[in-house]
Regions:
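Terminal alpha-helical segments
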Residues: 1-129
Length: 129
């Protein structure tokens, strides 16, 4: 079985830890955003694998979502995820290589919810099998 769900959960846990330390240093904002992006990416790739297919070999969450749509698979929070896709995708690189990276707390809070809903849905699939 794939380690993608375990990785998604670990990244989400790391994001939450960084979230609670954001007031200490901007580095925690970077870490929070990067780990949220990773949690969502791994969750979507997990859903593709659970649909019996190989996920798209890139970091663009829209590519995973488009593949899931072609497979007629359910995507939790799909509308919100599409709305925030550009922001989430940018966090993969911006948080690591852009010293002037800035994230809106409102975006972080919405994306935390999206990540939680995705992981919760993925976990429900494990229990069904």
């Amino acid at each position: 079985m794939s380690k993608l769900l375990a990785r998604a959960k670990a990244k989400r846990f790391s994001a939450e830890n960084s979230y609670h330390n954001m007031a200490l240093d901007d580095a925690y904002i970077d870490e929070c955003c990067f780990n949220l992006q990773q949690a969502i990416e791994f969750s979507l790739k997990y859903l593709v694998e659970m649909s019996g297919e190989q996920y798209v070999e890139n970091h663009d969450i829209r590519a995973q979502m488009n593949k899931l749509k072609r497979l007629n698979a359910f995507i939790p929070s799909e509308d919100k995820l599409r709305l925030y896709a550009s922001t989430i995708n940018s966090w993969k690189v911006e948080t690591r290589y852009n010293d002037k990276f800035v994230a809106l707390i409102e975006d972080i809070n919405e994306i935390r919810i999206i990540a939680d809903e995705l992981i919760k849905y993925c976990e429900s699939l494990v229990r069904i099998e």
